[in-house]
Amino acid sequence: MENVVIIDAVRTPMGRSKGGAFRHVRAEDLSAHLMRAVISRNPGLNAAEIDDIYWGCVQQTLEQGFNIARNASLLAEIPHSVPAVTVNRLCGSSMQALHDGARAIMVGDAKISLIGGVEHMGHVPMNHGVDFHPGMGRTVAKAAGMMGLTAEMLAKIHNISRQSQDEFAFRSHQRAYAATQAGHFAKEIVATNGHDAEGVLKRFDFDEVIRPETNLSGLAALRPAFDPVNGTVTAGTSSALSDGASAMLIMSESRAKSLGLTPRARIRSMAVVGCDPSIMGYGPVPASQLALKRAGLELADIGLFELNEAFAAQSLACLKGLGLLESMDDKVNLNGGAIALGHPLGCSGARISTTLLNLMERRDVQFGLATMCIGLGQGIATVFERL
């Protein structure tokens, strides 16, 4: 079986969904911009040799409909002979795109895949047009379709206090802002056109979503967002609504060598699991355990972790389940997470993988693990080995 290596990994800045930088920029344009960037950054690559494009997107309607992967590739002027498919595993969509592209290479059906994902949550809200089957309530709790209430459930089951959630959210903003100030995101962000508050066209090279002014007293003053009577989960301890795209260039190790391209990491293992929809946020625990088993590694072998950070309660429950609470500040989401950066659904899997790869290089770490919870009860994980 072919080894799959990561050649490049980039993303757009994360823009606020409500009146943010990308309010006048379409999802296809964000995607096409990154596709072009990946190709231009790797002059040894002939775009016509890409075997397939796998692009994650959850709300596949309006501007994100009718196979946005293909629409974006046409806008990017990638040769018409290169096919493209849009992938949907909800929050894990672009990580699933990575898995799909990698698997095609592993079995010999492809040599080069361009993968990534996008979500413009400002233009296409996450609940747009959603119509759950009324009979679902016979097999699944109705609240399982409300992500905030599943986070409340995890908080209750795992005794995650309101204070610890506020502290985790504060940490996310602090770390993301510190990473921005130190230039740690510069290697992964591709400057992208947007519009400032006055509507003036501007080139953005920073994440608009981070709130450096966040403090514990402000977080403590927020009301529960999902369970107004007994809840502990607030808007401040939930991932921000944002717009963005991410992309990765992957290929077989042999093709990278023949093209003279330097691999940054290899995919050591991949895993996806199901779990109870009522505690969908716990999916990263069994997914990570399965990925580690397939990689032949132990938790202690992993130097860095990236968790999608849908909610502080969800993240803390997973860290508790994996036994990572004590080492969190040394190993987990060191540049902050989705509470500060936002969680554009179809973009997030490749985004956290991109951030992880850069952290692994900066800290000289051999193994890293990226993992995500997925709405309605799934988890996905990928183990990377730095080269």
From Swiss-Prot:
Domain of life per record: Bacteria
Subcellular location: Cytoplasm
Coarse class of the protein's main subcellular location: cytoplasm
Gene Ontology biological-process entries: fatty acid beta-oxidation; phenylacetate catabolic process
CDD domains (alphabetical): thiolase
GO-annotated cellular components: cytoplasm
Alphabetical list of PROSITE patterns matching this protein: THIOLASE_1, THIOLASE_2, THIOLASE_3
Active site residues per record: 91, 343, 373
A molecular function (GO) term: acetyl-CoA C-acyltransferase activity
Protein EC: 2.3.1.16
Quaternary structure and interacting proteins, as annotated: Heterotetramer of two alpha chains (FadB) and two beta chains (FadA).
Name of the protein described by the UniProt record: 3-ketoacyl-CoA thiolase
Lineage of producing organism: Bacteria, Pseudomonadati, Pseudomonadota, Gammaproteobacteria, Enterobacterales
